[in-house]
Amino acid sequence: MPEVEVDNNNEKPSEINSFHHMIISSSKNVLKMEEVEVSKKRKFQTDQSDELSLLPLSKHTCFANVACSENTNGNSEIDTEYSMSSYVNSTTSMECNNDIEMKEESSGSCGEDKMISFESHLDYIYGTQNLEDFSEKVIENILYLDEQEEEEEDAKGCSSNAAKFVLSSGRWTVNQDDSTLHETKKPTIDQEFEQYFSTLML
């Protein structure tokens, strides 16, 4: 296989104006080389190895045709005299090692701490706390709260419930009493929307 050649001219890799770039054609599995112009401000992948751990994971995984080695060191610099196949192997192993490092970081004891902190909150929401935490008076209030509310509503009577309902627009109340239905004409839905949107336009 042809080797990647880069003219160093005693310059740092980030100061090189051009380098050879590989393209892998997935349909033919052929390696091609192109010369790519790079500004002096850009960095090579080897210069970015420290920054790669801070970036989010890439959306693509290792190439299917290239074996991903867990024993290779992805942070080592790539020698410019390697062949193109070794370049592909090293770049894919860097991606795989970053994936493995991120998975190891995410599976720590922090997850357990978060589960414990949310457990008491979820118990409070769904009412699955231990009954030992409550006094007897609090338990009676919780159990009989619904019954007390129903008794109070029955004592007030249905007529005092005010048979007025507010429409979804929130502006007009509709009486459900039979005597008031004959006095006022209820607007249609179209009229209600016209009135509502006309007030919004003002």
Swiss-Prot record:
Variant or mutagenesis effect after changing residue 61 to D: Phosphorylation mimic mutant unable to respond to far red light (FR) and to fulfill associated FR responses thus leading to very long hypocotyl, altered anthocyanin accumulation and closed cotyledons, abnormal constitutive subcellular localization in cytoplasm and impaired chromatin binding at direct target genes
Reported tissue expression: Expressed in hypocotyl cells of etiolated plants.
Position of sequence motif Nuclear localization sequence (NLS): 40-43
Record GO terms (molecular function): nuclear import signal receptor activity; protein homodimerization activity
Documented effect of changing residue 49 to A: Normal red light induced phosphorylation
CC terms in the record's Gene Ontology section: cytoplasm; nuclear body; nucleus
Modification after translation: Inactivated by rapid reversible PHYA-mediated phosphorylation at Ser-39 and Thr-61 in red light (R), thus inhibiting PHYA signaling in a negative feedback loop; this ensures the seedling deetiolation process in response to a R-enriched light condition. Subsequent exposure to far-red light (FR) after the R conditions leads to dephosphorylation. The phosphorylated form is cytoplasmic only and unable to bind to chromatin at direct target genes whereas the unphosphorylated form can shuttle from cytoplasm to nucleus.
Induction: Activated by FHY3 and FAR1 under far-red light (FR); HY5 prevents this activation. Down-regulated by FR, red (R) and blue (B) lights. Accumulates in dark (D)-grown but not in R and FR-grown hypocotyl cells. Repressed in etiolated plants transferred to FR conditions in a FHY3-dependent manner. Inhibited by light. Repressed by PHYA-mediated phosphorylation in R illumination; the phosphorylated form is a substrate for ubiquitin/proteasome-mediated degradation.
Changes seen on gene knockout: Partially blind to far-red (FR). Impaired inhibition of hypocotyl elongation and cotyledons expansion under continuous FR light conditions. Absence of FR-induced killing response. Increased seed germination rate in salt stress conditions. In plants lacking FHY1 and FHL, altered phototropism (e.g. phototropic bending) associated with abnormal consitutive cytosolic localization of PHYA. In the double mutant fhl fhy1 several PHYA-dependent phototropic responses are altered (e.g.
One of the GO BP terms on file: response to light stimulus
Main subcellular location of this protein, as a coarse class: nucleus
Keywords recorded for this protein, A-Z: Activator, Cytoplasm, Developmental protein, Nucleus, Phosphoprotein, Transcription, Transcription regulation
Modified residues (Phosphoserine): 39
Ranges spanned by the short sequence motif Nuclear export sequence (NES), renumbered to the chain: 54-57
Modified residues (Phosphothreonine): 61
The UniProt record lists the keyword Transcription: yes
Compartments where located: Nucleus; Cytoplasm
Quaternary structure note: Homodimer and heterodimer with FHL. Interacts with underphosphorylated PHYA, especially upon far-red (FR) light illumination. Binds to LAF1 and HFR1. Forms PHYA/FHY1/HFR1 complex in darkness but dissociates from PHYA and HFR1 in response to continuous FR light (FRc).
Similarity field: Belongs to the FHY1 protein family.
Function: Key regulator of far red / red (FR/R) spectrum-specific responses essential for the adaption to changing light conditions (e.g. de-etiolation), essentially by regulating PHYA shuttling from the cytoplasm to the nucleus and by directly regulating the expression of some target genes, depending on light conditions and phosphorylation status. Binds chromatin at target genes promoters, especially in FR light conditions. Can activate transcription of different genes, some being in a phytochrome A (PHYA)-dependent and other in a PHYA-independent manners.
Name assigned to this protein: Protein FAR-RED ELONGATED HYPOCOTYL 1
UniProt organism field: Arabidopsis thaliana (Mouse-ear cress)
